[in-house]
Design a protein with these regions (language model features):
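Membrane-embedded alpha-helical signal segments
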Residues: 1-169
Length: 169
């Protein structure tokens, strides 16, 4: 079967997956469950040798929803709107919100933060992008099975309501 939610990574990003990305995804699932009441489906992560090494792709039921690029050895500095001065690095785009960004050497982190840039690691970039894709496509992730689970949970606290609204089978 096709996975509901999938993250494909280029070979340059494989070691990020082995790092704290899995922990971050677990935190996102917890956060979205309390925020949206939606239990995010498990994320299938696979490497895709057809992708350029630093690119990743987010898919829902096999359809590509969005892509992004991160530099695993660098940090992303985003202009908070108040940034003073230009940072040396590789120009880029923060993929979740489309903000201009610069990929900088980790040694420049303090300077970037002193100049009012927001600095994040590549794992955070992917995690934030995934979170926003799930938020924007929550309706597509709400399966019949998921609705059934929500109804079962509701039976615990509001059995009468469920009896009135859901036809007996």
């Amino acid at each position: 079967g096709v996975d509901t939610l999938e993250l494909e990574v280029g070979y340059g990003l494989v070691r990020l997956v082995g790092g704290d990305l899995l922990d971050r995804i677990a935190m996102i699932r917890h956060q979205l469950a309390s925020e949206l009441g939606l239990v995010m489906p498990p994320v299938r992560i696979r490497d895709n040798m057809q992708l350029p090494p630093d690119r990743y792709r987010l898919k829902i039921r096999g359809a590509t929803i969005d892509e992004g690029e991160v530099h695993p050895e660098l940090l992303m500095a985003m202009d908070s709107g108040l940034a003073a001065g230009k940072l040396e690095g590789i120009p880029g785009v923060e993929p979740a919100f489309g903000l201009d960004a610069t990929w900088i050497d980790p040694a420049l982190r303090m300077r970037a933060e002193t100049q009012n840039s927001t600095v994040v690691d590549p794992t955070s970039v992917i995690a934030t992008h995934l979170t926003e894709v799930v938020r924007r496509h929550a309706d597509e992730l709400l399966t019949r099975e998921e609705v059934g689970n929500l109804v079962e949970q509701l039976k615990q606290s509001a059995a009468r309501l469920v009896e009135e609204v859901v036809p007996a089978q």
